[in-house]
Curated annotation (Swiss-Prot):
Source organism (scientific name): Baumannia cicadellinicola subsp. Homalodisca coagulata
Binding-site residues, substrate: 12-17
Residue stretches spanning the membrane: none
Function: Catalyzes the transfer of a dimethylallyl group onto the adenine at position 37 in tRNAs that read codons beginning with uridine, leading to the formation of N6-(dimethylallyl)adenosine (i(6)A).
Region (Interaction with substrate tRNA): 35-38, 240-245
Quaternary structure (record): Monomer.
Top-tier EC class: transferase
Descriptive protein name: tRNA dimethylallyltransferase
GO molecular function: ATP binding; tRNA dimethylallyltransferase activity
GO biological process: one example: tRNA modification
Length: 309
């Protein structure tokens, strides 16, 4: 019989952390963070990282494991998460994976697609071409190579455009073809739960309120500490995190304060929309209303308790 694991997946600002902490008080679970922003040290406010009290009450694994200058791939996550899950299961407890980085969840669940590593030489060639003809022209080029990927990638999303073209030039296979080749499936009996408000406007309101609270909590100072470093720039995954790249742009004098706020909130809403789109196509998942936390908690307990008694 396979060991049990629980996934709580949801868009940003949907109340995942709060639900996970409540669940830890009821079940023998250990929390593993599934969030590509929470891995970074010194990036606490803008990532809505659980505070000291919450982490004392319910420790989260895979938080604060990287410096913002370090790279951390999906493959790194899968290896780290599997290691933590093995340790937790061996201790007779249940891994509870919580977060909103959908690619991490998907890769862990179905196995990592064998994508080629980044190739500096190829990337430089693509970036030179983009500088000469523009990213919109490269998006049209991608349409001829991989229409499925091109339809998923916005013409202004230079990072994902670059990666899709790079994969093709390095491997000779399209990104879509490579993604369809999955590795080994997760050897756990996984119970998956999606949490979000029934009404999308509630999520938008929560995102807006949360960002203003981040500002009140010292988000500008937090980013200014990163901005002052000489080893960080906007090409890095850490600084591309939602909120950070907009504040970075403000600190660089590229936009004013009010525009920064507008862009950060808009980008966060866009991220939430993207996360929800992923979830809508997710298989074998139980939906929970984030505005009914006690009901959501009871639903999880009902499903899990009969399998651990």
């Amino acid at each position: 019989m396979l060991p049990i694991a629980i996934f709580i997946i949801g868009p940003t600002a949907s109340g995942k952390t709060n639900l996970a902490i409540k669940l830890r008080q009821k079940l023998p679970v250990e929390i593993i963070s599934v969030d590509s922003a929470l891995i970074y040290r010194g990036m606490d406010i803008g990532t809505a990282k659980p505070n000291h009290e919450e982490l004392t009450q319910a420790p989260h694994r895979l938080i604060n494991i990287c410096d913002p200058a370090e790279s951390y791939s999906t493959a790194n996550f899968c290896l780290d998460a599997l290691n933590e899950m093995t340790v937790i299961t061996a201790a007779g407890r249940i891994p509870l994976l919580v977060g909103g980085t959908m690619l991490y969840f998907k890769s862990l669940l179905h196995g990592l697609s064998p994508l080629p590593p980044a190739n500096v030489e190829i990337r430089t060639l693509i970036q030179r071409e983009a500088k000469a003809v523009g990213w919109a022209a490269l998006h049209q080029k991608l349409k001829k190579i991989d229409l499925v990927a091109a339809n998923r990638i916005h013409p202004n999303d230079s990072y994902r455009l670059l990666r899709a073209l790079e994969v093709f030039l390095v491997s000779g296979n399209t990104l879509t073809e490579m993604i369809q080749k999955s590795g080994n499936a997760l050897k756990y009996q996984v119970y998956q739960f999606a949490i979000m408000p029934v009404n999308r406007s509630l999520l938008h309101d929560r995102i807006t309120r949360r960002f203003h609270q981040m500002l009140a909590n010292g988000f500008e100072y937090e980013v200014s500490q990163l901005f002052a470093r000489t080893d960080l720039n906007t090409n890095m995954s850490s600084i591309r995190c939602v909120g950070y790249r907009q504040m970075w742009s403000y600190l660089a004098g590229e936009t004013n304060y009010h525009e920064m706020i507008f862009r950060a909130i808009s980008a966060t809403r866009k991220l939430a929309k993207h996360q929800i789109t992923w979830l809508k196509s997710w298989q074998n998942i139980c939906w929970l209303d984030s505005e009914q936390q006690d009901m959501a908690l009871n639903k999880i307990l009902q499903m899990i308790s009969k399998h651990i008694s």
